[in-house]
A protein has these predicted regions:
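Terminal, non-catalytic protein-protein interaction segments that mediate quaternary/complex assembly
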Residues: 1-140
Length: 140
């Protein structure tokens, strides 16, 4: 759960050119979505959303927020050009069906779309559906 592309892609593998362009001189990035939703320093939002949907399936609070106010002061520090594209992803269970709504600030087809599309889709199908359907308890 790092915000440095050198940690994420380590083991001698170079980060993709788009990440190198967006990162600071030292490899710092803002858009590590895994960090933004799973790390305790950013609220461990994934577990909170799962717990909310398990305990209150009709909730409107099952929301992961990918932005933070400090991005305005940080997005261009030390050569960085990384202003997070995804604003939030909201999950809803209605009529025994799980839906999600993604709010984007920006999404470019060349570099961002694959990641910005894959992230909520992966969470939706691989993690949330299986954990909600099989009622796995969330550790506190």
């Amino acid at each position: 759960m790092s915000l440095n592309i050198n940690d994420i892609y380590g083991f001698g593998k170079a980060p993709p050119a788009a990440w190198q362009y967006a990162a600071s001189k030292d490899g710092f990035i803002h858009s590590n979505y895994g960090y933004l939703i799973w790390h305790k320093d950013n609220g461990n939002q994934y577990d909170k959303v799962l717990k909310e949907l398990q305990e209150n399936p009709t909730s409107r609070r099952a929301l992961m927020i990918y932005q933070r106010p400090s991005i305005w002061d940080e997005y261009d520090l030390d050569g960085c050009s990384d202003f997070i594209c995804t604003n939030s992803v909201a999950y809803y269970i209605r009529h025994d069906r799980l839906d999600c709504s993604v709010s984007m600030r920006s999404n470019d087809v060349v570099y961002g779309y694959k990641n910005d599309y894959a992230n909520p889709k992966c969470l939706f199908y691989e993690f949330i559906v299986s954990q909600i359907l099989f009622s796995k308890p969330i550790a506190e």
